[in-house]
Amino acid sequence: MTDSIAAPAAATDKLVPFRHIFLTGGSGYVGRNLIRHLVARGVAVTALARSDASAKIVEALGAVAFRGDLFESTLAAGMAGCNALIHAAADTNHGPATEKQRRVNEEGTRVVLDAARTAGIAKVIHLSTESVLATGRPLVNVDETMPLPPKPAGGYSRTKAEAERIALAANGPDFSVVVLRPRFIWGRDDTTALPTLLEAVRSGKFAWISGGNYLTSTTHVANLCHAVELALGHGRGGEVYFISDAEPVTFRAMVSALIETQGFAVPEKTVPRFVVRTVATIGDVMAKISGGRVVPPLTLQAYATSAVEVTFDIGKAQRELCYTPVISREEGLAELRSAQHR
């Protein structure tokens, strides 16, 4: 689908002060929606594209493709004429830690920021994740003052936390870097999380963890795009902001609603939390001692994402970015149902 799900732009929209933006991760779920959102507001977007297929995707959405990857030697030249960078590219694998993930998330962030500075870019939005705080224990209404944990849940949390440190360390008087942390990104045109969820339902592998009756924050992709726009205009360099749909919801209610929008019956099977935690812990150990040759069915990283409460306070984004969701959870679910029946 190529139509935008972001909030419509006003005729005299002044929230985006930057007229030419360089985007990494443009062919991904969030990246595609960011291109639609920004192009609709008259912003020129140059998107990094690793392949011909990725280039076709971003060009079809109205961006100019710059062929290469995060480590492209001509990256700074590709950013010429841009005055802002949105760094959305990441290896989001929740499996065992890998060197590839470390290189993409950590070194890739450093290289992209260095290129942006060389190109004279003034503002950077670094898309992070609430998973930088994940350890496997509940995160209950936390805010940005919570420190990064010394022992994160897994490779994704560890490398994204280090990417945050790299991004924030790069902030300076002439190079403003703002970090956004969304949680549970969802919405129309999802080609990653929702299809994976539905495949688990189809195959009979889906099960609730302790019934799924724990709270979670969520972030509709249109709300994330809106937050990026606000952060470009109002975000303070060197600061981190949580972004969500505002009110939390139980994990079971949210996932059930997503499944139902696609015409599937919601499974009832449930597994005790301690069993899932044990399987995840053993899986991590087996992957480590086998040097990655054993691929576990579950990791502590995946457990930390889906088995415990994860909610946070978005008061800082509301105060400093003037952020408020532009689409409600009910509207987003209705949009998914409508798209399914077209």
Residue ranges and their predicted role:
Residues 24, 187, 209-214, 241-248, ...:
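Glycine-rich Rossmann NAD(P)(H)-binding loop
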Residues 162-163, 191-196, 210-232, 238-242:
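Substrate-positioning beta->alpha
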Residues 103, 138-185, 206-208:
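Catalytic helix-loop patch of NAD(P)-dependent Rossmann-fold dehydrogenases
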Residues 53-59, 63-107, 111, 115, ...:
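NAD(P)H-binding glycine-rich loop region in Rossmannoid oxidoreductase-like domains
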Residues 2-11, 20, 312-320, 324-342:
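Amphipathic terminal alpha-helices
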Residues 230-296, 314, 330-337:
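Mid/C-terminal beta-alpha module of Rossmann-like enzyme folds, strongest
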Residues 107, 111-155:
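Conserved Rossmann-fold NAD(P)-dependent oxidoreductase catalytic core, especially the SDR/UDP-sugar
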Residues 21-41:
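N-terminal Rossmann NAD(P)H-binding glycine-rich loop of SDR-like oxidoreductase domains
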